[in-house]
């Protein structure tokens, strides 16, 4: 019996009245699958890995924090946060701090 779980993630950015779209100039960079056999490495864990990678890239590029959301599904990509196992939204500081 396999205990592996596939966690599929996607990073989206707001796109005005059209809603959300895949993040960045290379959206495939921010879409993928993490396979884990450790029950502690759940959807929230995968989202934390992706957020850490995003923030590291922003620092490397000297870019400001951006408004994005990280969506994680179990086994297969869904349509949005409504069918996700976990979703976190990052919003930039609007007060400049």
Where are these regions (language model features)?
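Short aromatic-glycine-(Arg/Gly/Cys) micro-motifs in beta-strand/loop hairpins
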Residues: 2-28
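A short, exposed loop/beta-hairpin motif centered on an aromatic-Gly-Thr core
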Residues: 21-41
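Mixed-charge, low-complexity intrinsically disordered regions enriched for alternating acidic
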Residues: 38, 43, 63-67
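Short amphipathic, charge-patterned alpha-helical segments
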Residues: 42-54
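Short, mixed-charge low-complexity intrinsically disordered segments
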Residues: 52-97
């Amino acid at each position: 019996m396999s205990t592996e779980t596939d966690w599929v993630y996607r990073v989206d950015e707001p796109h005005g009245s059209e809603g959300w779209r895949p993040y960045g100039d290379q959206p495939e960079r921010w879409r993928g699958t993490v396979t884990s056999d450790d029950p502690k490495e759940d959807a929230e864990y995968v989202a934390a890995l992706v957020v850490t990678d995003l923030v590291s890239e922003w620092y490397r590029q000297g870019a400001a924090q951006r408004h994005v959301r990280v969506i994680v599904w179990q086994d297969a990509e869904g349509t949005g946060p409504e069918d996700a196992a976990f979703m976190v939204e990052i919003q930039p500081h609007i007060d400049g701090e």
